[in-house]
Structures are given as C-alpha cells and as structure tokens.
Amino acid sequence: MTITSPVIKTPPLNSEIRLESNLTVESGDIEINEKDIVNASEVIVILDAGSQYSKVIDRRVRELNVASEIHPLNIDLLELIKIKSKSGSTIKGIIISGGPESVYGENAPKFDKSLFSEKLNLPIFGICYGMQLMNYIFGGKVESNSQREDGVHNIEILKDENQQLVSKLFKNLNQTEQVLLTHGDSVTKIADGFKIICKSDDGIVSGIENERLGYYGVQFHPEVDLTTNGKKMFSNFLIDICGCSANYTLDDREQQAITYIKSIVSNKKVLVLVSGGVDSTVCAALISKAIGPENVIALHIDNGFMRKDESLNVEKALSVLGLHLIVVDASQTFYNSTTTIKGHLTSSLKETISPEERRKIIGDTFMRVAENEVKKLGLQPEDVYLAQGTLRPDLIESSSKTVSGVADVIKTHHNDTELVRILRDSGRVVEPLKDYHKDEVRELGKSLGLSDSLVWRQPFPGPGLAIRIICADEPYLVNYDFTNNVVQYLVTGEASSELESEVKIKIDKQLTEMKCKRQDKITIKPVLLPIQTVGVQGDGRTYSYLLGLYSSENSTIDQIPWSYIFNLARTIPKICHNINRVVFIFSQNATKHTNIKVSNEPVKHITPTRLTPDVIKQLQHADSIVSEQLYKYNLIKSLSQVPVVSLPIDFGVTGNRSIAIRTFITNDFMTGVPAIPGKNISFDCLQEITNNILTSVNGISKVLFDCTSKPPGTTEFL
C-alpha cells in the first residue's frame, strides 16, 4: 500500500485540439427527456460528468434567478438547441460538472463533438473534471497528482499589470479565497490560448480561462457551501459573462410541485410513507394540499430501529395534518427480512454486517410491508401510488439515473433501492421533493403552515438506528500496521523502524506543504480503530479506517487544543487515503468520570456486534440522552443533524462498545462541517452528554466526537 498516487502521464499530444479523440461522439447518444426541459425564456445547461454535486450546481443557478437543466455530458447539444428554440427558449451558457474519472482514463465519459465547436459558440464554465476536459481537449496536459487535494484550501487569484483580479469570473472577490478541492488529477500544462487565473495553496493550477472563447474553468467546487464566495463566481459567470437577465423566480415551486402531483396521481389514492421527520411530513402535507386529505393514506412503519418513543411522537406530530394515519409495528418482519441483490439471497437483516446490504434489505422490506397494508385496506396495488419524501442528496448519493447516470454510488438510500427504482420506472412513485435540499424543504414546510416543532425536528434516516450501528464479527486489519505507523509518525514524529525513511520524507514534505506543524510538546496522540466507515472523496465512495485522537494529559474539554485537533482531522485523510474519518476520544478528566484509559498499544480487538435487541436498546438510550441535551441547550436549529452511532470498540473491556457523536452543520447535506466545541456547541453541553452516557448507559467504554468535514466523511457513519 502507498499513501500517494503515482504520476500517470496523458497520451502524447497529437494535435492542438483533440476533437477527434475517443472521448467524443458525433451526436449525443442519450435521448432527450421532455421531463428535463424547463419552460423558461433563458436557460443554462448543466452537463453532468458524474459529479455528486451536479444538482447543487443546479440549485446555485436557480438561487440566482436563472433557469437551468441538467443533461448527461453526451447529450446531443445541437438537437437540444433546436428543441429549446421551438419553445422560445434560449440557451445562454453551459456548465460542465466534476466527476470521478480521469480525462485520459478508459472510463472517461463521452461528450458531444459540438460542445467545443464554433457551431455552439456558447460560454462554458468547467468545474473540476470540466476544467480538465477543456484544457485537455485544447492540447493541454492533465496528470495524476503525487497527492490528492481533498478538503478546504485557499486559492490565490492572480492579478494583472494594473493590480486588478485577472478574470471576470472573480469580480468583486478577495485575492485569497477559501474553496473546496476534491481531486487527484491536475492541469500541468496549460492549453494554447488559455491562461492561469488562480492557484491553490499547494501551488497547483486551480483556474484557467480563454476569454476570447468565453471558456472558464476552476479545479475547485464553487457550488458547495465550503467555497465561501462560490455563489458570487456563479453570478459573475451567469450575469456578466453569459448575459442572463436573472428574471426566473422560484416563487412558483410549490405550485409546480402540486401540478406535478396532480398530473401523476389524477383521482387515485396515495400512500405516503411517513417517518415523522421533516422530509416525509412536508411530503404528506404537500400531497394533502394537492389532492385532499381524504385521498391520502399516511403509513408509519415501525421497523424496530426507531428512536426512543419515536412512533408515539410521530402520531402526535402528524395528527395536526388531519390525515388517515396507520401505524404498523413491523419490527419482527424487518429483523428477519431478506432481499435479493444481483441474484443472491441475503442473510436476514439481524445477521447482516454489510451496511449496503442492510440499506437494501430495509428499503425493499418497506415496500413489501407497504403493499401488504394496501391489500388490507381492500385497495388494488395498481390503483395506489407510493409517495416518498426523497430529497436530491438521497438520489445523488445512491447514483440514481434520475439525477445522473454516471455518478459513483456513495451509499444506497432506503428510498432509492432497486425495487423503488422499478416502481419509479412504472410511474407508481410520487416524489414531489426530489429536486429539493433539506433547507429548501424546511422553507416549503413553513409556507405550508407546519409548526416549528415539525419543521425543525432533527433529521432521522428511514432505516433508523440500523445504519447507526457498526456491525462486525472481527476487527478490520487490512494494512493496519503500516497505516498505524504512518499516522503515528504524522502526528507525533515517532514511528517504528519498519516505516521506511522515504515514507517519512514524503509525510514531512506534505505536512510542510499543508502548513500543518506538529505540536512542540506532543500531547495529542493517534489510535487507529479497526473498523470502517463510509466516506466520499473525489466524487467517489470510500469505505475506510476510523482514526481516533486523544490527549495523553487527560485534559478537560475546555483545555483540549480544538483548533489543532480540527487541523489534524483535515490533514490526515489528505495524506493517508485509507482513513476517511477522524474522531476525538474523550479522556477521564474530560468527562469527569472514571472510565477506561486509552492505551498506547494498537487497538486490534472489537466486540462482535449484530443488530440484536440489546445493542439497539443501548443506542436508543444514548441517542435519547443526546436529544435531551440538544433541546436543553437550544441547538436544534443550529446543528443540522446529530447522528449518535454505536461502535464495536471496547478499549480493552470485553463486551463493551463505544458511542460516537457527529454534530454536523450544513445547508444542503452535500457538504458540511463539524460543530466546534466552545463555538457551535458549548463545553457544558458536551460535558453533560458524555457524563450522562458513561454513567447511565451500561456497557459503554468511551464517547467519541467526530471532527470530520463532508467530504471526506459522509453525514452518517454508514
């Protein structure tokens, strides 16, 4: 295993412009779907190269009052222009998204040959992969980096001879800007006619332009919240470069959703799966408004993995909508359920370790239970539509073709399994929120008259606690010793003699480039935990190690050097790619509770864990403690989501487990940051949470605090 990627050179340059390359198609081979066409006088076309963030680009454009459409990269653009012109619509510009492939790779997505031709003659904004493609096609060079750039970085915008920022794209921005970078390839030779407009803090080309052609490219992601002024960059491209009039308003989105519901459902019944969370509640309220509450059947399925007293709270919350609510206790059905994946029958859910299989079993079982309830009501399944509060991030992370045909699967969401896709393809699934992100759903909920207590409930995944319990029969130890040596040296400067000097030199060089210095007096130490969590890096899925950090001085919570901890949490996954999540392990003094000390020895033991009743009750208890404190300290609105996770790490006490807490802050759940103790969450709140868990939940060795941004860690651990 290596911690860096080899340099892979692109094929030899045969011509100035590679429009005859194997990446092009004569005309797009994807049929244009009328449902993807927006009725607006001006439109920006977003070409999806497989990015997890394509719909976020779409959202940013809409926020600036410009209509947008997402199409596959290989759509027939000239045919699309014809279709748009017939309806009186003009395409004003094109945005090419990022993606997980390399422009020189065998699996690089194809694009329509007219994209960069004079026939099209439209401004183009290439993001990440889009910039690399633009540079490569015009004769530049793209190579694999010696190390990835993943996470928040600063870029330096270049100035011209008059000391003005060199590009229209960056008008009214600062010379130094914070951005999100997630890439393993970089532009190493600029194509003729293009110029560099910004560089990263690592000195890597982060932006190029050809002003004459109206082509602009950035290596970072301006669409996500972690890029501080990304929205301004989009505004500069849309208004100043493309000349959009910005007269497309979003006021009618609720009415559009109602029209969509009526057009699909007509006079039939709709079965709404309601968990009690904001997504399903808003979905139920919207459908009720569209077709009347008498035509809506609200079904709450208790799958056995709910929060403490969840089903009772759901009944109270949904009674205000005046819906016909059915509550079904299907816990035993779920525990014993199986499904078929690629022709293979899975084990029962209670025996399943794989998080992906668990999600698929749960999703398919939801559908089967729902169909059974329809039959009990005397309704024919073909006369009933299924409604779900599916959001855009769910479809993106599941790589649904509704959003993208080429995005990597990060995780399967319970509301986007293969069975749901079959129902969707047959036209029997209604998903009025599929173009919405979480904060937009909350705004819609307010406009529908829902109370704050409903709109601001902490999000809870449909599969429930089943995906907040990390199951394992044995420790994960693939390349454990090497990885442990790497992080020991990275954090402390000390490592076993087995770690080669060449690796140490690389680590020191990377730490210097990232401006991350080790402590003068080493008090923070790492411990590699032998389990895996799900992450997203470079538009792709990772299933990698969890790393713990702890204080050797047993500092209290307010004495912990949090800024240094978060710096390590950003740095470690960038250098050691088989770690995607970093947690801080609270010590004895930090929790004011006599508990188990973290050993300096490698952790190579776990408590075998499955979805058994005792494990579920243990997590329910811990989760309820966290929820109580969130309400007590008025953190329900400021913390977007707080997953509480059971880990099979015993820290030397046979049979024990540990609890991890992820205090996550985000607008759209596509990217986000952890809450900072003492700033976003008080020391007292953390103190009470950890003390209460350790004193009142039996069998818990440690409480861990997640310090990881998204990316590289996903919102949930699994």
From Swiss-Prot:
Pathway annotation from the record: Purine metabolism; GMP biosynthesis; GMP from XMP (L-Gln route): step 1/1
Pfam families: GATase, GMP_synt_C, NAD_synthase
EC category: ligase
UniProt keyword annotations, A-Z: ATP-binding, Glutamine amidotransferase, GMP biosynthesis, Ligase, Nucleotide-binding, Purine biosynthesis
One CC-aspect GO term: cytosol
InterPro entries membership: Class_I_gatase-like, GATASE, GMP_synth_C, GMP_synth_GATase, GMPS_ATP_PPase_dom, NAD/GMP_synthase, Rossmann-like_a/b/a_fold
EC number: 6.3.5.2
PROSITE patterns: GATASE_TYPE_1 (PS51273), GMPS_ATP_PPASE (PS51553)
Active-site residues per Swiss-Prot or TrEMBL entry: 128, 221, 223
UniProt domain Glutamine amidotransferase type-1: residue ranges: 43-247
Domain GMPS ATP-PPase, residue spans: 248-457
Molecular-function annotations in GO: ATP binding; GMP synthase (glutamine-hydrolyzing) activity; GMP synthase activity
CDD domains the UniProt entry points to: GATase1_GMP_Synthase, GMP_synthase_C
Positions that bind ATP: 275-281
Catalytic activity annotation: XMP + L-glutamine + ATP + H2O = GMP + L-glutamate + AMP + diphosphate + 2 H(+)
GO biological process, one term: GMP metabolic process
NCBIfam families noted in UniProt: guaA_Nterm (TIGR00888), PRK00074.1 (NF000848)
Subunit composition and interactions: Homodimer.
The name this protein goes by in its record: GMP synthase [glutamine-hydrolyzing]
Organism: Dictyostelium discoideum
Lineage: Eukaryota, Amoebozoa, Evosea, Eumycetozoa, Dictyostelia
